[in-house]
């Protein structure tokens, strides 16, 4: 009788803990969606910035790169105000000022968004391909529809005076499976 009672108590405790964990996961998912909206509606975010956020138990970690220091501060403040956020840890880096990098950003963005295959992205309020340039090294980040678009974007970003190109673009299918 005691064994059955302790097994039942253990099962009840495990169910309670797992449902609490499940509820916290759901809150974190909802919070991540709210944070995503807050980031994408930040008017000063451009295709030359890339911000990512992770959420665990209401604690938000911001990562990525921005072109100006005030953007880092603004984003931290915006995320802190999102309902449900307990704390924010910012690991956002500010890209160094460089005329060479600025010119390279313009060349790469014209090459990609000037290509007819990417015109549908170019007209979006927040185009999905982000072009991060640091010290002549180009990183493509964001989401595209297919692997063909990912390969084309990388090809278009090559041969414009860059030292290297890192293609961190993901397809819609890859993002959905995460």
Identify the meaning behind each predicted range:
Residues 2-178:
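N-terminal targeting leaders
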